């Protein structure tokens, strides 16, 4: 993302750590803009971006493995502060002349370190708890470096070259298990890099609107409206930037929540005076999905069909060159990067055909979900719309496990409406990050009245989270869960059992498919 010259930037280089997005997230929480880029970024690109600081993320590899990730050592000569985290510290040590070796056993979990530094650890207790996760260890630091923290298991828990402003820590300050991790990152960003912390959603809007106007010119844009928070925010942002050059295409694929289609037309078509075309493509999608049970295949089919529908609609319009989507940072990450294994393909980034005729515009693909909500409020979208439940592009298609049928969709649609109603009545909307029902491909025996039943099981998924990268199951009061269960079993046909998902992310993802 191209930033205005006055915008402070902390550049995070990705070496494949499962935590690397958290680094970016923590820095943004300080009001400083941060981006995650591949470790192969060139020196020229870095100079052009003009970051105030560079952070080298952790990673699962050893610095001595064949083909292990590395960087251009010239990074250390740019005069820009550098902080290496775990793998980033080991790589820094190796590239600058120190020594690293394979540890006898992997160090994983909490550890106590003792610190001594007036920069990274300024204002922090000398003894603190951190989260270790590494298999290599530093045995000799480069010339010019000093030890600023040690632990019972390592003499080099943190190091610094204060003159060149190069630092390394053998633990993960970005995870919440590290007691003063945010404070350490804040010291690096504020004290070492001298960032003022002026990144706001207001700034983001100004920059993004200018980018959109420069790129689009007098051409036209189609926006994929799904009814979810992300695509709604994208539509309003684009409308603010280019007005009537925007045409929103709302594809009603028959996989929407109860009442979703009418709500979209009323709130955005009438409320924001947008040009929205509603396309009834239910039969088209259902025919494509008939007999398909594999979740990845379902996502690909839905993503492809979305684009083909857009193609059909665009052919009826003149001068449409761009397709806008509500892709988030987490969507891009979960679809896999050079250093990250694909967890699941996201329909916005993984299902697009190679011969697609549109150029993509993804104006919020560097934002996390909570940042998108803040952006929505700043854009003037009513709170009740901004705080609507996240809804994936494939819709209920990935909340019906296995093959999709009309009857199964109706079960999920009605049970989900009951869940959302009870959560709202109990005042839990803001406490729970995301909640929805799923229909596993499971039937079980039950008794209703005097009769034996053999019907469907509905699963409830409700999680708490800050940014969607990690989550835990919500501790909903048992009486509330009982109310939800009772209503679903009594009001939704062909359901005789309700279960509650008590799994965190990781190891599970929030969605079941």
From Swiss-Prot:
Domain GMPS ATP-PPase: 199-388
Catalytic reaction list: XMP + L-glutamine + ATP + H2O = GMP + L-glutamate + AMP + diphosphate + 2 H(+)
Protein EC: 6.3.5.2
Highest taxon, organism lineage: Bacteria
SUPFAM superfamilies xrefs: Adenine nucleotide alpha hydrolases-like, Class I glutamine amidotransferase-like, GMP synthetase C-terminal dimerisation domain
A Pfam family this chain is assigned to: GMP_synt_C
Keywords: ATP-binding, Glutamine amidotransferase, GMP biosynthesis, Ligase, Nucleotide-binding, Purine biosynthesis
Gene Ontology MF: a single term: GMP synthase activity
TM stretches of this protein: none
Residues the record marks as active site: 86, 172, 174
Any one annotated GO CC term: cytosol
Pathways per UniProt: Purine metabolism; GMP biosynthesis; GMP from XMP (L-Gln route): step 1/1
Domain annotation Glutamine amidotransferase type-1: ranges: 9-198
InterPro entries from the UniProt entry: Class_I_gatase-like, GATASE, GMP_synth_C, GMP_synth_GATase, GMP_synthase, GMPS_ATP_PPase_dom, Rossmann-like_a/b/a_fold
Residues bound to ATP: 226-232
Cell inner membrane among keywords: no
Function: Catalyzes the synthesis of GMP from XMP.
PANTHER family linked to this entry: GMP SYNTHASE [GLUTAMINE-HYDROLYZING], GMP SYNTHASE-RELATED
HAMAP family the record matches: GMP_synthase (MF_00344)
Quaternary structure note: Homodimer.
Name the UniProt record assigns to this protein: GMP synthase [glutamine-hydrolyzing]
Annotated organism of origin: Staphylococcus aureus (strain bovine RF122 / ET3-1)
């Amino acid at each position: 993302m191209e930033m205005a010259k006055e915008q402070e930037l902390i550049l995070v280089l990705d070496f494949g750590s499962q935590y690397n997005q958290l680094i970016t997230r923590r820095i943004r929480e300080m009001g400083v803009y941060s981006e995650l880029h591949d470790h192969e970024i060139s020196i020229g690109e870095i100079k052009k971006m003009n970051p105030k600081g560079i952070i080298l993320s952790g990673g699962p590899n050893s610095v001595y493995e064949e083909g292990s990730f590395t960087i251009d050592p010239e990074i250390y000569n740019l005069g820009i502060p550098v902080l290496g985290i775990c793998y980033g510290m080991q790589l820094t040590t190796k590239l600058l002349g120190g020594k690293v070796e394979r540890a006898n056993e992997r160090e994983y979990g909490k550890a106590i370190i003792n610190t001594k530094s007036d920069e990274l650890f300024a204002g922090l207790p000398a003894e603190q708890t951190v989260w270790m996760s590494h298999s290599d260890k530093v045995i000799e630091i480069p010339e010019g470096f000093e030890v600023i923290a040690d632990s019972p298991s390592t003499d080099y828990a943190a190091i610094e070259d204060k003159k060149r402003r190069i630092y390394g820590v053998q633990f993960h300050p970005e995870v919440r298990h590290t007691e003063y991790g945010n404070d350490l990152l804040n010291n690096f960003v504020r004290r070492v890099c001298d960032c003022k912390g002026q990144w706001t959603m207001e700034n983001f809007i100004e920059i993004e609107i200018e980018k959109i106007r420069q790129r689009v010119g007098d051409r036209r844009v189609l926006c994929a409206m799904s009814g979810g928070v992300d695509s709604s925010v994208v539509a309003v942002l684009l409308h603010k930037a280019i007005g009537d050059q925007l045409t929103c295409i709302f594809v009603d694929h028959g996989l929407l929540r109860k009442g979703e289609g009418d709500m979209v037309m009323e709130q955005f078509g009438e409320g924001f005076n947008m040009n929205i075309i509603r396309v009834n493509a239910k039969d088209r999608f259902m025919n494509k999905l008939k007999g398909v049970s594999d979740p990845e295949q379902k996502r690909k089919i839905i993503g492809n069909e979305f684009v083909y529908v857009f193609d059909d609609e665009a052919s009826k319009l003149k001068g449409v060159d761009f397709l806008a989507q509500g892709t988030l940072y987490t969507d891009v990450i979960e679809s896999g990067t050079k250093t990250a294994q694909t967890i699941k393909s996201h329909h916005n980034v993984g299902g697009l055909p190679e011969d697609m005729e549109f150029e993509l515009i993804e104006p919020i693909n560097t934002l996390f979900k909570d940042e998108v909500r803040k952006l929505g409020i700043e854009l003037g979208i009513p709170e009740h719309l901004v705080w609507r439940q996240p809804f994936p592009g494939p819709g209920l298609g990935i909340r019906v496990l296995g093959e999709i049928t009309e009857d199964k969709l109706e079960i999920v649609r009605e049970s989900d409406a009951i869940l959302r109603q009870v959560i709202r009545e109990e005042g839990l909307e803001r406490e729970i990050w995301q909640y929805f029902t799923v229909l596993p491909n499971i039937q079980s025996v039950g008794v209703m009245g005097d009769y034996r039943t053999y019907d469907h099981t509905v699963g409830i998924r409700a999680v708490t989270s800050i940014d969607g990268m990690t989550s835990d199951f919500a501790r909903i009061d048992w009486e509330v869960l009982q109310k939800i269960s009772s209503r679903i079993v009594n009001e939704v046909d062909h359901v005789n059992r309700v279960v509650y998902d008590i799994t965190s992310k990781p190891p599970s993802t929030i969605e079941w498919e």
